[in-house]
Amino acid sequence: MARKPSKTRPSKAKSGPALTHIGATGEARMVDVSDKPATERLAVAEGRVLMTRATLDLIVSGNAKKGDVLGTARIAGIMAAKRTSELIPLCHPLALSKVTVDIEPDAKLPGCLVRASVKVTGPTGVEMEALTAVSVACLTIYDMIKAVERGVRIEGIHLVEKLGGKSGHYRA
């Protein structure tokens, strides 16, 4: 049975910063950025894919059945950054200036450290694009090795750094 949407309105108490994607009556909305200046913005995100040492060795040696795991994941992450507005409903479509996805095998984890950097000159930031790039790159690694190891874990996806815009510099 389908649930009826709640008619409860959000509290009007000013206890902290307002959510920019929520309208006065609680509806989701896309933020109007038309009056914001175009400035250079950068976001960096990272995450980890944890696996056994044997699976990591298979990836590093290039002997995975599905092919070049790291190269495929890198391209998937770049593609995902460019399509973020199609995946996350209230994100603005952006003409990204640069997307890099770096994947470092790490025997100490064991696993792979995935890091994405996204740059734009525009009226809104690229945090979601960086996080989406990392998420999809990690998921691609998982997809390409799941037949070898079912216990693979994706962990720690987070924003590492953000530069530009009204809120300035952030570093985790």
Swiss-Prot record:
Homohexamer; trimer of dimers. SUPFAM superfamilies: Molybdenum cofactor biosynthesis protein C, MoaC. It catalyses: (8S)-3',8-cyclo-7,8-dihydroguanosine 5'-triphosphate = cyclic pyranopterin phosphate + diphosphate. It comes from Bradyrhizobium diazoefficiens (strain JCM 10833 / BCRC 13528 / IAM 13628 / NBRC 14792 / USDA 110). Residues 1-20 are annotated as: Disordered. The active site is at 143. Its EC number is 4.6.1.17. GO terms for biological process: Mo-molybdopterin cofactor biosynthetic process. Residues 1-12 have a biased composition (Basic residues). Belongs to the MoaC family. Pfam families: MoaC. Keywords: Lyase, Molybdenum cofactor biosynthesis. This is Cyclic pyranopterin monophosphate synthase. Catalyzes the conversion of (8S)-3',8-cyclo-7,8-dihydroguanosine 5'-triphosphate to cyclic pyranopterin monophosphate (cPMP). InterPro entries: MoaC (IPR023045), MoaC_bact/euk (IPR047594), MoaC_sf (IPR036522), MoCo_biosynth_MoaA/MoaC (IPR050105), Mopterin_CF_biosynth-C_dom (IPR002820). Pathway: Cofactor biosynthesis; molybdopterin biosynthesis.
